[in-house]
């Protein structure tokens, strides 16, 4: 891989996705987050249009990718973000295990000096007309947005907060939370593929002492429905939604 190359992700909110966010962008590559809710032909289009060389994906999405991988002509490897024992069965030769790739790397890495105007991440719209449109974010714009989200009249995230980011990391970079929380020193609780599941959200809020969360109204309706049906309560730690 060379500086400026595109590295795509097709994943939920989890720690391996966070590692890929930072590992790719801070190495000089462009992290391209793919929305799995797009139609398969749209995913093929944006992978080819972005010229993604590698795609990092959660095992959940392998059935989707296996059906379209042959049409993604520029992809050199599909990295499944799991351990060897949880790898899906496939006959494709260019499928790699994330944890094996990580284990094979040296612990010593010299981070490059990057131009602040260079591209950091890439998102595609899901607009109503034509194919999705790509939007590049620079390192500078990402840093400025991160600072802006931390001010009191915005997210006001601090080192004492525990953030549960439910908005997907493939949706405008989870509204900047993957960058803002580490800068502030806030703890992040990652819901994985259960980000819309009421019982899981209630358990995470109570067990981890979540103080802040970000998500669309549908998610909160799912949580509210679960609480009403089960009689369960969430702790008063959650003060900012």
Predicted segments with their positions:
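Conserved AMP-binding/adenylate-forming
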Residues: 1-41
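Conserved adenylate-forming
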Residues: 1-2, 105-118, 122-164, 176, ...
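Conserved AMP-binding
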Residues: 11-14, 35, 157, 166-171
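Structural core segment of the AMP-binding/adenylate-forming
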Residues: 26-103, 206-209, 216
